[in-house]
Amino acid sequence: MENRTPMQHHSGYEIVKSEPPSTPKTLIKSSYMENTPEMVFGSFPIHSGFCTQVVTHTDPMNNNNQPKTNANGRALAADRKRPYPCNLCSSKFGSKMELEEHQNSHTGQKPFECDTCNARFNRRSTLWNHKRIHSDAKPFVCTVCQMTFKWKNSLKCHKDMHQRKNETSAHLDNDLRQLTYATAAKRKLQMEQEENGGLPASSSASSVISHPLITTTSGNKKRSKAAKAKQTPSSLATTLSQVHLGAVQPLHASALVPPSDHQIDLDTTSLDSLMQSQNQNFLMQLYGYSDDGRHNGGMLSLDDTMLSNLSDSKSDSGSSSGGLSIQLPMQTINMLNFRNLGTQQLPPVHQLASSLPSVSSGMDYVNVNQHDSHYIVSQPDMMLGNQPLYHNGSFANIEKSNPHNNQFTIDSCVLLPSSRQDYPFDYTMVNQQYPMQEQVHDQTVGVSVVQQHYAEQAHAHGKTVPHEQW
């Protein structure tokens, strides 16, 4: 009978577990970790000779890094167009700038930043596409319905709709395949210039200023230069427009004429003194002062009593509106000559009424001499007792005991200038049947007494009295 013993020491698990690892990954990793890293890829170091060692381990038939030549030994056209290969991969590029952008994908650097949202990108083209989000520019234009789009895919979907309706051709589809964002923007700018008659379109210029298409530089220095280049033409244009508007703008009348509410402050003292002197000279000539040689000197030679009685009647506006109570000295005034009844008339004195102060002193026609052709004007306190009173062309003797006297104000048109010329005046020619308004006062003088004296001394006509019988 055979005894079977288990093989405890010959298990395959224990043998495999005891073997040391001999995979090529560990060998490669251990060999690269011993050296100093020169490039950072993600979160682990990469040796500078990584690409060369990888190429050595690859198939020897793969010669991507070696330039391809033709039978004459010259490099092919594709290789001549892309002379800048990548050290980390088999990619080739036509410019050094494109190679640097490609290496950013290996290193993880993002040097291109958006000015609006501060987003960073590793490729410049990616930044260009991102900036379309912030701008309202729509450079892609449909050639059928002239609709504009921001993205090329949107225009392509729109063209498919026209193609289903048989509104487009294959030539337009081929043109759409070769269309890029830059070429679409240039084409739209040319179309706007043609519509405006060859002049640069203002809308396109405003769109370029407000919505820049592309930022091709990553440095701040070049960016500041581009900003200055954009701001310089606009600032010059605004300055020239302001100068042009300032030259064409007309002159306003308000700059020459002061406003209506502007109060002009004038010194009226000289005008007041002039008017006062004229008024005083007129009063002097009116009451006979001009005949006397002592009073021909003007305002300075007036009598002190007359100057003391004059008061200032000037109101706030500078015009004499209030009346003056002036006590005039006793002087003789030429009365009207009723002998010669001619057609001559008195010169009007109403023209001087505005410049003269109104005289409101009460006068009495008393003490009339029958042999003299003058009326004596006296003050109320110098009234005589039993004197005849002139009333409606006749004389009336009023008793001294009668306290009422017919007092009235002299009208300015009755006063004569100082030349003492006799003017014929007929009261009946002016007022035939109406008595003088300011001379007749039935309330103060008895009607019966007036009628009695009127019957005794009236003339045959009953209206006037001859000059010789006064």
Swiss-Prot record:
GO terms for cellular component: chromosome; nucleus. This is Zinc finger protein pat-9. A motif (Nuclear localization signal) lies at residues 221-230. Probable transcription factor; required for proper organization of muscle myofilaments and for their recruitment to the M line. Expressed in body wall muscle and gonad (at protein level). One of its GO terms (molecular function) is chromatin insulator sequence binding. It is found in: Nucleus; Chromosome.
